[in-house]
């Protein structure tokens, strides 16, 4: 489960995490925290220290995307994997993140990093630096479908028995260009989605939805 943790009062954020931690106690659930680069370095560090006991899979975008040194500082001071990259759109930008040891997990967005081809280049570069890749997934059902195919093809970063496989970020908020755009929408069942195996991305666009939302 990914939690968006953005707020001005540290005590409120702490209480929120305590409630979530209590609700998920003894359950087979992994938590990720996304702060959408809401904080400066010092506040992100304080929050990160408070989050360490929750054994997070990752701490996403703790500072603004441009603050590469800030990412690196947090990564060196926290015992939580640092994730980022959804707002980085070029291979050269990701190269800078990797060279500065700024992130543990790269999150290119297939819809804005050059599509499937661009994502493949970023994935190969990330793995050459030993960086895990877990794409950011947002937007339309077409972006979802492309992301699912890419995620399914990503090899484990470290070839070992206990290597982690990437997971699909699956937003369930109301969005007509996700549910209504496909003739057969994706269905989440027990935390899993079947990977389409038809031609192309494996999906069929609902043309009635296109007509409904088109503008002249």
Describe the residue ranges of each PLM region.
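Aromatic/hydrophobic pocket-lining residues that form the small-molecule binding cavity
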Residues: 13, 17, 44, 67, ...
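C-terminal extensions of enzymes
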Residues: 175-216
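Alpha-helix-loop-beta-strand connector modules within alpha/beta enzyme cores
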Residues: 13-33, 70-84, 131
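Shared catalytic-loop signature of beta/alpha-barrel
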Residues: 49, 55, 66-192
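Phosphate/pyrophosphate-binding betaalpha-module
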Residues: 63
């Amino acid at each position: 489960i990914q939690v968006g943790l953005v707020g001005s009062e540290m005590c409120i954020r702490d209480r929120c995490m305590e409630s979530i931690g209590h609700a998920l106690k003894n359950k087979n659930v992994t938590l990720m925290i996304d702060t959408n680069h809401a904080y400066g370095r010092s506040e992100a560090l304080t929050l990160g220290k408070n989050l360490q006991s929750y054994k997070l899979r990752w701490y996403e975008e703790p500072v603004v995307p441009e603050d590469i040194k800030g990412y690196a500082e947090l990564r060196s001071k926290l015992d939580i994997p640092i994730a980022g990259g959804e707002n980085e759109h070029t291979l050269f930008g990701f190269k800078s993140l990797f060279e500065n040891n700024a992130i543990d997990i790269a999150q290119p967005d297939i819809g804005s990093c050059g599509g499937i081809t661009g994502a493949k280049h970023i994935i190969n570069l990330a793995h050459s630096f030993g960086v895990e890749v877990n794409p950011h997934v947002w937007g339309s059902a077409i972006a979802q479908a492309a992301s699912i195919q890419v995620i399914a093809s990503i090899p484990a970063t470290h070839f070992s028995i206990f290597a982690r496989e990437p997971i699909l970020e699956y937003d369930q908020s109301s969005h007509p260009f996700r549910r209504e755009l496909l003739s057969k929408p994706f269905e989440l069942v027990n935390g899993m989605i079947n990977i389409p195996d038809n031609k192309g991305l494996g999906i069929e666009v609902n043309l009635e939805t296109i007509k409904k939302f088109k503008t002249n």
